[in-house]
Amino acid sequence: MNSHFASAHTPFYINTKEGRYLVLKAVKVCDVRTVECEGSKASCVLKVDKPSSPACERRPSSPSRCERMNNPGKQVPFMRTDMLQNMFAANRDNVASRLLN
């Protein structure tokens, strides 16, 4: 890794006029010139693309327990296990016959 770059402690939040941003990955850059600018001059202002989704909305809290629908006539289909049992038995027999020959 270049000596001029170092990983910053992440994740962290940045508070701006537009809202709060979560930074998941950041790179600390050393020995780089800082350009001072004013907000009225748009040539050096950070551009932030507005998200297409609505502003941060709180999702409704998830249920505290799993609710199961009890339908006595409806059963969950299961895979036939004898198919796997037959496959393993055939494999075992093949290995045994190779060892004996």
Curated annotation (Swiss-Prot):
Keywords: DNA-binding, Host-virus interaction, Inhibition of host innate immune response by virus, Late protein, Phosphoprotein, Viral immunoevasion, Virion. Residues 51-73 are annotated as: Disordered. It is found in: Virion. One of its GO terms (cellular component) is virion component. Its main location: virion. Phosphorylated on two serines. While these phosphorylations do not play a role in virion assembly; they are essential for the interaction with host RICTOR and RPTOR. This is Phosphoprotein OPG062.
